[in-house]
């Protein structure tokens, strides 16, 4: 099964549905990637901070070696972590991440957060997380402009075909677009019916920046992180609005939530290690929700953000 794609402003096509690597266990990651490729997934969304890029690369290599897929048919995404925002740190860490994946280039390399932290030597701790080598929250003075200029050089050197940002507000995008020589191809944000961010999505798309949603199932991704809001918020899978629409279309609640995004040209990156759910999550483009159903789902908005750096105890 293949999915439609979004034409990026860089000229490349990005699949509308991909497989996210956040919280994918290192022990099972290689197999999960391999089986996802067999199921038809072509976009894989990784990051330094996820700590599983070596294993993900092994899954990709196995699929390529067995002739299931060619490298050029895959769309591999990774992210620049906060500790490497200084201009002279961007290229070295990108090269390390490429080596971890066993790749020559990333299809898309993203600034993970608009937060610059003090450099942590990968030889000391990797992934570095939020704390410095002194186990304190320490910031770098690197500006977004300094970081973005270094990101642009990755495209010049063919280490990344496209570059993008994540967790940026509209105001930060406005600032970035004033000086960007290479415009961000994508914006990845937390996006689900409890956090619709409609104005941000509209602005980004108007500027020709493709939007990718993470945590499409809302609190589900954050319950195991023991976040109070996630525990106290009704699960979207159990919400009467979502369940009713799913029943009407003969789909699962997960498929409805994903289609709510993809029908508005927002890419999604769910994950699963269940073969049935893998196939179901990929089947979220060949059928449509009614306009009234999209509106009903969007009306569930609470402006409730789960992935909030200010919620981290050390901040």
From Swiss-Prot:
Gene3D superfamilies: NADP-dependent oxidoreductase domain. Substrate binds at residue 112. One of its GO terms (molecular function) is aldose reductase (NADPH) activity. Its EC number is 1.1.1.307. It comes from Aspergillus fumigatus (strain ATCC MYA-4609 / CBS 101355 / FGSC A1100 / Af293) (Neosartorya fumigata). The record marks 79 as: Lowers pKa of active site Tyr. The keyword NADP applies. This is Probable NAD(P)H-dependent D-xylose reductase xyl1. Pfam families: Aldo_ket_red. It comes from the Eukaryota. Pathway: Carbohydrate metabolism; D-xylose degradation. It catalyses: xylitol + NAD(+) = D-xylose + NADH + H(+); xylitol + NADP(+) = D-xylose + NADPH + H(+). Keywords: Carbohydrate metabolism, NAD, NADP, Oxidoreductase, Xylose metabolism. Catalyzes the initial reaction in the xylose utilization pathway by reducing D-xylose into xylitol. Xylose is a major component of hemicelluloses such as xylan. Most fungi utilize D-xylose via three enzymatic reactions, xylose reductase (XR), xylitol dehydrogenase (XDH), and xylulokinase, to form xylulose 5-phosphate, which enters pentose phosphate pathway. One of its GO terms (biological process) is D-xylose catabolic process. One of its GO terms (cellular component) is cytosol. The lineage of its organism: Eukaryota, Fungi, Dikarya, Ascomycota, Pezizomycotina. Belongs to the aldo/keto reductase family. Signal peptide: none annotated. CDD domains: AKR_AKR2D1. NAD(+) binds at residues 166-167, 215-224, 271-281. The active site is at residue 50.
